[in-house]
């Protein structure tokens, strides 16, 4: 029994840091690299992880060093771990070179060490490896941790109670095949100033594992919920959500249309990512559609919904129907 290491990242960062680790520590056995490229979807990444694990011995424990908490590599590694409860796996995010070197060191120094001990040592070393020069730029460590006290209402709020103005605030509504992942957690959530993420999907609401992964992928200070479309429609009309500022995530434009037709007030829909599949045409490098998708967007347009085609907030807005026309979807 040993420890197999998977280095995982958005783009080719994992390949580069693997090469850097080899320059410093020499070539290592039982190391696999998983990269998530712009033209790939979650299922591609899921397959990459499963292929990587198959390269290790059946009794090897698995250590995943991923780039970003709540990013797609983390999410798919969590999915694989959840589907293999008998296989010891640990996932550490914040990938840097000190982390990788320490992982190699831990394996070399104590071949019998369990993955729990190895992970604890790696986390400490990867944090200690972040330093600044001049030294006075380094933050002073607090002697006692600052604890936030959150006052929450105990028990259910009675139906009919009006909070604030009684209207759910939809700060951002987005179509994204990947739902809650790194770009949404680290870019769109703060940009939208949302205090709650609502994933509205009948499919995901019935999948306990995916619900768990989405909840743990939420950024600090923001709650994530997974609900069927009907529950989103109910919540949009419930005065108890008057102080909620929500980021709504739809897996498909069809789900967004159902919500709007059910009375959810969405004035603008951010179209961020639609994964490619058989029968669909690439509209740009992250959007893939078929005639049904186009018809759905046309219905949304007829319901006075406008569209913001951007993968991340810093992108310039694109015109959805100009992209569709150029793609010549048949």
Swiss-Prot record:
Domain (PTS EIIB type-4): residue spans on this chain: 166-330
Q: Where is this region: Hinge?
A: 143-161
Q: Does the UniProt entry include the keyword Cell membrane?
A: yes
Tell me the protein's name.
PTS system mannose-specific EIIAB component
Reaction equation(s) it catalyzes: D-mannose(out) + N(pros)-phospho-L-histidyl-[protein] = D-mannose 6-phosphate(in) + L-histidyl-[protein]
- GO term, biological process aspect, one: phosphoenolpyruvate-dependent sugar phosphotransferase system
Task: State whether it acts alone or in a complex, and with which partners, per the record.
Answer: Homodimer.
Primary place of residence?
A: cytoplasm
Q: What is its EC number?
A: 2.7.1.191
Q: Which PROSITE patterns match?
A: PTS_EIIA_TYPE_4, PTS_EIIB_TYPE_4
Q: Which residues carry this modification: Phosphohistidine?
A: 10, 181
Q: Which GO terms describe its molecular function?
A: kinase activity; protein-N(PI)-phosphohistidine-sugar phosphotransferase activity
Q: Per the entry's comment, what about the domains?
A: The PTS EIIA type-4 domain is phosphorylated by phospho-HPr on a histidyl residue. Then, it transfers the phosphoryl group to the PTS EIIB type-4 domain.
Where in the cell does this protein reside? Cytoplasm; Cell membrane
List the transmembrane segments. none
Q: Name one GO cellular component term.
A: cytoplasm
**Residues annotated as domain PTS EIIA type-4:** 2-130
A Pfam match is: EIIA-man
Keywords (A to Z) from UniProt: Cell membrane, Cytoplasm, Kinase, Membrane, Phosphoprotein, Phosphotransferase system, Sugar transport, Transferase, Transport
UniProt xrefs under SUPFAM superfamilies = PTS IIb component, PTS system fructose IIA component-like
Residues marked Involved in the phosphoryl transfer between H-10 and H-175 (site):
91
What top-level class of enzyme does the UniProt entry assign?
transferase
Lineage top rank: taxon: Bacteria
């Amino acid at each position: 029994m040993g420890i197999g290491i998977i280095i995982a990242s958005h783009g080719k960062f994992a390949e580069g840091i693997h090469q850097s680790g080899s320059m410093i520590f020499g070539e290592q056995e039982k190391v696999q690299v998983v990269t998530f490229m712009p033209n790939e979807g979650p299922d591609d990444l899921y397959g990459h992880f499963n292929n990587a694990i198959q390269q290790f011995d059946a009794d090897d424990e698995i250590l995943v060093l991923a780039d970003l908490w709540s990013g797609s590599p983390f999410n798919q590694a969590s999915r694989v771990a959840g589907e293999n409860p008998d296989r010891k796996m640990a996932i550490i995010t914040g990938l840097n070179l000190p982390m990788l070197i320490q992982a190699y060191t831990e394996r070399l120094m104590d071949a019998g060490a369990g993955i729990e001990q190895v992970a604890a040592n790696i986390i400490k070393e990867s944090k200690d490896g972040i330093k600044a020069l001049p030294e006075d730029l380094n933050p002073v460590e607090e002697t006692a941790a600052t604890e936030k006290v959150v006052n929450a209402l105990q028990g259910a709020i009675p139906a009919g109670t009006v909070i604030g103005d009684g209207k759910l605030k939809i700060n951002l509504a987005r179509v994204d095949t990947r739902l809650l992942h790194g770009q949404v957690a680290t870019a769109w959530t703060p940009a939208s100033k949302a205090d709650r993420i609502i994933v509205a999907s009948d499919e995901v609401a019935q999948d306990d594992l995916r619900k768990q992964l989405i909840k743990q992928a939420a950024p600090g200070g923001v709650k994530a919920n997974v609900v069927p479309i009907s529950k989103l429609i109910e919540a949009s009309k419930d005065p108890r959500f008057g102080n909620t500022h929500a980021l709504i995530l739809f897996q498909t434009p069809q789900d967004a249309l159902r919500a709007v037709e059910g009375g959810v007030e969405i004035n603008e829909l951010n179209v961020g990512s639609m994964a490619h599949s058989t029968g669909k045409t690439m509209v740009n490098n992250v959007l893939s559609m078929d005639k049904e998708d186009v018809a759905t967007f046309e219905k949304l347009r007829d319901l006075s919904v406008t569209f913001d085609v951007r993968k991340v907030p810093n992108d310039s807005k694109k015109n959805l129907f100009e992209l569709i026309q150029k793609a010549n979807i048949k």
